[in-house]
């Protein structure tokens, strides 16, 4: 995936040293965009192996509106363990905001259900937006939303999605985010009777942690391989009816995994 490697190169060459919340330190740029044509293969990094199982289960977990890691742990996914409390709770993170945003008037809004309905009935709307950045509840979240707002766009029978990510851990987080939102776009397109268009990934603070620099340089020595394809069970027409077994990533032949520590 050349787009991702170009991002890595850009930050290594142009990034500025910055301190950060975790105390690890980063090199960072502000403002960057990548585009992926979903008809040209499923966008997943091939220059290191990713755990697609974790990506799928995390996305299904978001869509359930769940904010406890029990479901993830039961399915062998550990990516949220460091932030959960002793009961496995994370506070009102992504799933809560996507499915049951609480407004100041006390009304609860299911943003995902509403945006699906709007895509079907009013596809030219410029309000096809889901927002996870609920200012009133940020302090209650174990981790403030990094990928915080996404918007859909319908044109020529195709559904595209643009994500705004305020904070992007380029080595560990971004590869997951690319594949997760690409998959969400494909799922949304299917249930809305559309074809997948583009996934556009826009960043605010895009950074490499100081303890990921050598791993990133190693990855840049590897030549990207052909993108795999994602098969989605065509019989599923309800976004919330998808299960793990409805997805099959075909012809994924990545280089070996590269270990790196997560900054908490």
Curated annotation (Swiss-Prot):
One of its GO terms (molecular function) is thymidylate synthase activity. GO terms for biological process: dTMP biosynthetic process; dTTP biosynthetic process; methylation. Its EC number is 2.1.1.45. One of its GO terms (cellular component) is cytosol. The active site is at 146 (nucleophile). It holds the Pfam family Thymidylat_synt. Homodimer. It catalyses: dUMP + (6R)-5,10-methylene-5,6,7,8-tetrahydrofolate = 7,8-dihydrofolate + dTMP. This is Thymidylate synthase. InterPro entries: Thymidate_synth/dCMP_Mease, Thymidate_synth/dCMP_Mease_dom, Thymidate_synth/dCMP_Mease_sf, Thymidylate_synthase, Thymidylate_synthase_AS. Pathway: Pyrimidine metabolism; dTTP biosynthesis. (6R)-5,10-methylene-5,6,7,8-tetrahydrofolate binds at residues 51, 169, 263.
